[in-house]
Amino acid sequence: MLENNLKQWFGHESFHPGQKEVIESVLQGNHTLGVLPTGSGKSLCYQFPTYMQQKPTLIISPLISLMDDQVMQLKSQGERRVVCIHSGMDEQEKKENINVLNQSRFIFLSPEFILQSHHFNLIKNIPFGLVVLDEAHCLSDWGYDFRPHYALIGQITHHFKLATILALTATAPPHLTSDLEHILKVKLNTIQTTMNRKNISLSHFNFKDDDEKIEWLLKFIESSGPTIIYVSSKKICLQLAKLIYQHGYLTGIYHGDLTYQERQTVQNQFINNFIPVIVATSAFGMGVNKKDIRTVIHFHLSSSPSNYLQEIGRAGRDGKQSQAISLYQPDDAYILETLLFNDAIVSEDVETFELGAFLPPNKEEILTVLHQNYTFKELKHIFKTSYIRKQAGYQRIIGYTRIDQCRRKFLLEFFGESPNQSNECCDNDSDLSKIECYNRKKVKRQFTFNEKIKNLFRV
């Protein structure tokens, strides 16, 4: 029965592992957490029940690029009753999309948008059959001290009492189910496959300084194929992209300060192979579905094992052999520690907030949002727990740079998973084949990097 509909609606002969089990759970009315690896077709898990039940679906999504990609995918399948509203749109486009909300089958919104009362009023009477929390690990990873509105999503799901909740992610630490159940105030049926992407080999290189890293990188990208290079800051993003461009390769930049239109331009040029290399902060993360990315390089370490698996999961979505490579020099530990802990909210900040004493504006804003739903005692416990988890993630990522055991096993055991060793596994236990996918130099005349950026964005 389900396979017949799969063929009719999506043109597929069979489900990927985990898809059918998640769909069956949802169709039985169970609130469900689906943990499926990156690139395994998680969006089918909500599209299929939507067509089956003939009721509208609300998808709460963390990133604009992720929403746009899924809307584009649905429209390419012939679906016209799909709409999203986000901060990258101009007012006219927002108005047009608001006008068709009640006629739409798939509605994509951010938590910040939907939790504003005048926006919530636009959808509160829509009879949703399904409420989807996409990239659900973000509720646990981001939902307290980065995107605090995530921790209030339970207000939305509680309103739509007749809707089934479906949370989807590719990375699930052992505490994720209990975190989500606490936020949503429901019991979840957890269906978990593997987080392991066997077609992505893992390698790591240690250097004495950034100059050594850059020298290695400029040589390596000659044959790395379509490549994302992750860095820790906008400043390094611009500097590294400029060096790669001067080396002869058209290079895109992607960071949080770009406008929505600029991000779209870079993504489209990368997806359509006009540029072979993107240098990005983690803002590039989850939203681009380019299937033939061969290489993901972390010039700086990722902020957690969960983020690392998400970021390397951009590679090899066509099923072909791909590679994830991390680079490290001694100063990088300080960079990561600063990013993770310098502005982290701790229980002492909650006490200060409770007393009405001065706090930095960003911390005060976050605690003000969260205090709508949580007592001071609960907030102290939340941030104490969050700090301990960050410390554990930090130690695991730093440990990754020092180990001589299987890298895949070391990463996945953090999530309670014990993978079987595969060919092309990692540099510690396999003789990895070199991926030869040459990036042709395309810089014909010597534009400056700034001229190239101006041409790219037409400024």
Task: Give residue ranges: language-model regions.
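Helicase motor core with emphasis on the C-terminal RecA-like subdomain
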Residues: 2-45, 49-55, 60, 65-108, ...
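C-terminal helicase lobe
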Residues: 228, 234-236, 249, 268-275, ...
